[in-house]
Amino acid sequence: MVTILQLLVSILILLSFALVVGVPVILVSPGEWERSKNLVYASAGLWFGLVIVTAAFNSFVI
């Protein structure tokens, strides 16, 4: 159970890092926002879902 929680947290950290680096680059690049808008929204939704799943799973571990 703890290993699964550690895996979820690791994925959350990696996705957070990718969003912190990627979103500003997309916003600064001219014309890139229109092409990557769906990817940014999908990634943000995945991040939010992963936060909820990790929090729910954490309540079972402790």
From Swiss-Prot:
Its main location: plastid. This is Photosystem II reaction center protein Z. PANTHER family: PHOTOSYSTEM II REACTION CENTER PROTEIN Z. Belongs to the PsbZ family. Coiled coil: none annotated. It is a multi-pass membrane protein. GO terms for cellular component: chloroplast thylakoid membrane; photosystem II reaction center. InterPro entries: PSII_PsbZ, PSII_PsbZ_sf. One of its GO terms (biological process) is photosynthesis. May control the interaction of photosystem II (PSII) cores with the light-harvesting antenna, regulates electron flow through the 2 photosystem reaction centers. PSII is a light-driven water plastoquinone oxidoreductase, using light energy to abstract electrons from H(2)O, generating a proton gradient subsequently used for ATP formation.
